[in-house]
Amino acid sequence: MAEINSLSELSMATSITEPHENVVPVHVQKLDSQGRAYATGKRKDAVARVWIKPGSGKIIINNKEFDKYFARPVLRMILRQPIVATNRDTQFDIVATVAGGGLSGQAGAIRHGISKALTYYEPELRPILKKGGFLTRDSRVVERKKYGKAKARRSFQFSKR
């Protein structure tokens, strides 16, 4: 590399490689051999594997209808948020396997997986899902228990006498 002795030489050396303006990252459709988009979603201790394919809007979780797997309406609403936000209610069939955690974490993991799979299937949906916060991994996990404490932060009962 040539020696640079002055500021003018430095500006000449750096001006040769100007960055391209208006560079937009290209998102390509990612499908498997059966025409499905696959993604994994995580929330707390739950990990979900999600496949989406064109269909009638059927959702199957661990080989059960999602109405039977998630009895609480709040969990069903959480799970359907990315589909409703993108107006794809009846366009995709969703198959998910989920393990670990409780029902709330599992619903969040499936929601995260559906969002990622939708972006793999239709990359133009990414800005909508990103704006809604569906693509962001919720990194909050349970705080570990500390020794000398009853729980993570709760102390044992204190007695003066």
Swiss-Prot record:
Q: Name one GO molecular function term.
A: RNA binding
Which InterPro entries does the UniProt entry name for this protein? Ribosomal_Su5_D2-typ_SF, Ribosomal_uS9, Ribosomal_uS9_bac/plastid, Ribosomal_uS9_CS, Ribsml_uS5_D2-typ_fold_subgr
Q: Which UniProt keywords apply?
A: Ribonucleoprotein, Ribosomal protein
- One BP annotation, GO: translation
Q: Name one GO cellular component term.
A: cytosolic small ribosomal subunit
Matches recorded under NCBIfam families: PRK00132.1 (NF001099)
The similarity comment for this entry is: Belongs to the universal ribosomal protein uS9 family.
What is the protein named? Small ribosomal subunit protein uS9
Q: Which organism is it from?
A: Bartonella tribocorum (strain CIP 105476 / IBS 506)
